[in-house]
């Protein structure tokens, strides 16, 4: 049970960091603030250090092999799936902002 929760959190944090790094580095936008991104990155780094056997089995393991929480610049943000998700989130974010203005 714990290993499933750890794996799910590692996957979630990896995807969040990948997508939001893509938004930032490829599209020159920011949806989450730096403090939130850093919190996710530190949590991921700690989980990967505490549970390396689980982390090695979770999606995107190779991309996060030597990850430290300092930057998302070297992550594979140009992956087509990541770029598509980043675009979807930017569209959703824009729609939410437009709805708030009404």
Question: Could you say what each language-model-derived stretch is?
Answer:
Residues 1-102:
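Phosphate/adenylate-binding "loop-and-lid" substructures adjacent to NTP/NAD/dNTP-binding pockets
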């Amino acid at each position: 049970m714990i290993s499933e929760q750890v794996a799910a959190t590692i996957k979630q944090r990896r995807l969040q960091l990948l997508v939001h790094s893509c938004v930032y580095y490829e599209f020159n936008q920011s949806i989450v603030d730096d403090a939130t991104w850093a919190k996710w990155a530190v949590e991921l780094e700690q989980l990967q250090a505490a549970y390396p056997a689980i982390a090695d089995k979770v999606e995107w393991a190779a991309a996060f092999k030597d990850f430290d929480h300092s930057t998302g610049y070297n992550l594979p943000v140009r992956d087509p799936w990541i770029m598509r998700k980043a675009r979807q989130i930017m569209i959703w974010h824009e729609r939410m902002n437009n709805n708030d203005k009404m």
